[in-house]
């Protein structure tokens, strides 16, 4: 469904994305894990066609994003980290506007009602978006991504800034959408991706450093402990002391 081959993005002498390749199968929920600045959002923006790559290709359901941008983009629903909402509109008016902007070729009223039902915002249809909680605004963002029934959903940090209950609700929503869509979800939090995704790619400094099923990756990191210490003294003495610790 999604195929990325030898993707590279340079900003001057900096490689934001460094020759990465991966595929995502139909109906798969893929987690894209890495710290801030690792290259996650850059990769997402290339996949969705928002920016071009320096080299490499992205193919969405058989359509290459640069050669067939219109056809490829029509197969993608994108939810950026900050949803593109017009907060002075009502939920319904906003979705009608986005429906027209995307030139969706489906019955307008019925399709918008179905999308609102899927993300559970039907009762919020006539409310002004700026008066909604962050959790409901995120659901409106999901609704706009679903307009047109795209087979692929790209979700960039979809739970960032939400409270614990809202996070649980969004996780459930993503899992339910995964039954009918291929999903790529980015996050810098392993527990967040582990709770939602079938498979995890780990990216660091623009390179993929791990690719595994969620349970396999969770098992490989289980039992590891991290300890943060604050030490005082000469740097040379501290380094010497650390080197004398077994297994360090």
Place the predicted regions along the sequence by residue:
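Conserved ABC ATPase "signature" region
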Residues: 96, 100-124
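Conserved ABC transporter NBD signature motif
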Residues: 56-67, 71-72
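ABC transporter nucleotide-binding domain
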Residues: 171-248
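Walker A (P-loop) phosphate-binding loop of ABC-type ATPase nucleotide-binding domains
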Residues: 35-39
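Catalytic Walker B motif of ABC-type/P-loop ATPase nucleotide-binding domains
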Residues: 153-157
């Amino acid at each position: 469904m999604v195929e990325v081959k030898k993707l590279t993005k340079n900003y001057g002498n900096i490689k934001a994305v460094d020759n990465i390749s991966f595929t995502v199968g139909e109906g798969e929920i893929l987690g894209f894990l890495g710290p801030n600045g690792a290259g996650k959002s850059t990769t997402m923006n290339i996949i969705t066609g928002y920016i071009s790559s320096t080299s490499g290709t992205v193919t969405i359901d058989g359509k290459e994003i640069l050669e067939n941008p219109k056809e490829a983009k029509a197969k993608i629903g994108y939810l950026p980290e900050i949803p593109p909402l017009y907060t002075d509109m009502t939920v319904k008016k906003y979705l009608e506007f986005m429906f027209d902007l995307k030139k969706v070729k489906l019955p307008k009223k019925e399709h918008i009602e179905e999308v609102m039902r899927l993300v559970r915002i039907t009762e919020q249809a006539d409310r002004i978006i700026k008066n909604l909680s962050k959790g409901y605004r995120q659901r409106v963002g999901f609704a706009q991504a679903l307009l047109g029934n795209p087979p692929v959903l790209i979700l960039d940090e979809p739970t960032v800034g939400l409270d614990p209950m809202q996070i649980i609700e969004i996780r459930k929503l993503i899992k339910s959408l995964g039954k009918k869509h291929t999903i790529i979800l980015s996050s810098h939090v392993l527990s967040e991706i582990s709770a939602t995704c079938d498979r995890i790619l780990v990216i660091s400094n623009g390179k993929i450093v791990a690719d595994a099923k969620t349970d396999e990756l969770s098992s490989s990191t289980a039992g590891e402990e991290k300890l943060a210490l604050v030490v005082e003294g000469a740097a040379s003495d501290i380094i010497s002391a650390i080197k004398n610790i077994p297994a360090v």
